[in-house]
Amino acid sequence: MWSKIRSMMEGHPERLRVMRILIENGLGLRGNEVYLNDIEVPVVRIAKSAGVDRRTVDETIRMVETNPELKSLFSNLRSAGLSLRGVAKQLGLGVVEIVVEDPHKPGIIAGASQLFSEMGVSIRQALVDDPELSPEPKLVLIGDKQVPGEIIPRLLKIPGVTRVSVY
């Protein structure tokens, strides 16, 4: 879907930035309004985040409203909810970010989960970007304690994994 959106926005990089902000933050559209689940978000805040003016956000919303496929997507988009990533350090949790060459390849989550289990780390949260909606999808696993650094080379042996970061 993301490649289709990029194609539709060719020649309008500022509108593409607006759409990216909406998708990455799970912001949906209802009529001419932007929502974070049930909370209305002022378009001026979206504009500031995307580095565009308010009119560009309004134009993008109008364009989405006239395209049935985009309207269906954005009218049903909702935030996935709470992420522990930003507070992991304060809570004594470990964070592992995994990037893969082909996000459609099965077995990445299973392989990573197995390694966490072998190291005695319970997964508190798994966050996976949708490869159809995110231009740079990642898998983020948050463990119940700090994740040992020796997991990195083992994760890199999982077929398809190209980069691993432990925080």
Q: What are these model-derived regions, one by one?
A:
Residues 2-33, 63-167:
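A conserved regulatory-domain signal marking ACT and ACT-like small-molecule sensing domains
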Residues 43:
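Helix-turn-helix DNA-binding elements, focusing on the entry/boundary residues of the two helices
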Residues 46-47:
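Short alpha-helical "recognition helix" segments of helix-turn-helix
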Residues 60:
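Active-site/ligand-binding neighborhood in enzyme catalytic cores
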